[in-house]
């Protein structure tokens, strides 16, 4: 089936099966396994090295405040590139973006494991973040292709459970690894998992059933998006590191200027990179705001708590990880119950 599309700045042609309704068993299970593995790796690596930051700072002989960039570099790249890669997935194919993301993430993990200096480790985390951004950007779209429409809620629920568990399981897994191996193994363990995930995804993930022909990727919007979010994180980091106010003010002014240009460019687009049309829906915008606040609070705790337990209370890396294990354990038990209740109780109450 073919459908023509036209916009103020885009012309294209939609070609493919517009009635696609997911995969059949047993392929659906293998495809979801490949999807969950990549997503789990991407999310858990945002927190897995938090417990090891004091050890990394000590071994590389750098201040604790500088070692935070091992975490920040990863998160910064994801924030800058998530929307551009999501847009690219529509044109290039979700499966292709996902596969390239697995490759970049696995190579980044190898470079992290071999790093002997902080700059090299941070640069390697940038490569990891590039891969994670590619994986995360197309994850939900791949889930929609895998599951039939009547089971899509099940797929999205399982996906959310994987994200929730991976978000808080990092310290526990980190403690288990650090109990028997040095910190480079936190990254080396990703390599075999990444290789297996790549071949599983290449074999079982579906290609885009619908392709857009004739519409080009908007590099200008991608650069503006990356610059806006990059300047935002940069200003926050500059403030936390006591950078002179004039530089911070300059960064804020640049962020606002670039951000205004970016936002204005999105209005009137048929395919905006920043979906303001969705944000106009109250329930959607409220849900997004709630999720952002929840994950922000969670990540702040996950980053700060290891330093509190190690530097203030004197726990080692293993003890710190064990104390933080209660968080993911509760999620493991509560998440399935919440998934069962969501069809019976209003989500707002849950």
What are the functions of these language-model segments?
Residues 35, 42, 71-74, 78, ...:
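Structural signature of transmembrane alpha-helices in multi-pass secondary transporters
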Residues 72-86, 136-140, 325-338:
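Central cavity-lining transmembrane alpha-helices of secondary-active solute carriers
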Residues 52-81, 120-123, 313, 318-323:
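Extracellular/periplasmic helix-loop-helix junction of adjacent transmembrane segments
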Residues 53, 85-86, 94, 139, ...:
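Hydrophobic/aromatic and small-residue hotspots that mark the transmembrane alpha-helices
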Residues 1-44, 58:
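Cytosolic juxtamembrane N-terminal segment immediately preceding the first transmembrane helix
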């Amino acid at each position: 089936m073919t459908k023509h599309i036209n916009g103020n700045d885009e012309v294209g042609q939609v070609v493919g099966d517009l009635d696609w309704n997911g995969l059949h068993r047993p392929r659906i299970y293998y495809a979801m396994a490949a999807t969950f593995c990549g997503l789990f790796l991407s999310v858990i690596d945002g927190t897995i090295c938090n417990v090891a930051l004091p050890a990394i700072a000590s071994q590389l002989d750098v201040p604790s405040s500088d070692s935070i960039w091992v975490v920040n570099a990863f998160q910064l790249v994801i924030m800058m590139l998530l929307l551009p890669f999501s847009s690219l997935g529509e044109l290039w194919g979700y499966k292709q973006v996902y596969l390239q993301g697995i490759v970049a993430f696995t190579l980044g993990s190898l470079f992290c494991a071999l790093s002997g200096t902080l700059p090299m480790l941070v640069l390697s985390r940038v490569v990891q973040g590039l891969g994670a951004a590619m994986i995360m950007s197309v994850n939900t779209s791949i889930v929609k292709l895998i599951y039939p429409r009547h089971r899509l809620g099940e797929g999205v629920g399982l996906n959310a459970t994987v994200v929730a568990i991976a978000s808080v399981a990092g310290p526990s897994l980190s403690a288990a690894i650090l109990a028997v191996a040095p910190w480079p193994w936190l990254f080396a363990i990703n390599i075999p998992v990444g290789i297996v995930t790549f071949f599983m995804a290449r074999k079982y993930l579906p290609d885009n059933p619908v392709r857009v022909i004739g519409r080009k990727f908007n590099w200008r919007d991608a650069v503006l998006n990356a610059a806006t979010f990059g300047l935002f994180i940069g200003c926050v980091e500059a403030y936390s590191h006591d950078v002179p106010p004039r530089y911070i003010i300059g960064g804020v002014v640049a962020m606002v200027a670039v951000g205004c240009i970016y936002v204005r460019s999105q209005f009137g687009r048929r395919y905006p990179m920043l979906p303001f049309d969705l944000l106009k829906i109250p329930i959607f915008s409220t849900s997004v705001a709630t999720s952002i606040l929840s994950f922000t609070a969670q990540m702040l705790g996950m980053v700060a708590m290891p330093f509190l337990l190690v530097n203030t209370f004197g726990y080692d890396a293993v003890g710190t990880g064990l104390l933080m294990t209660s968080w993911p354990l509760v999620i493991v038990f509560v998440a399935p119950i919440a998934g069962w209740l969501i069809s019976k109780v209003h989500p707002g109450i849950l």
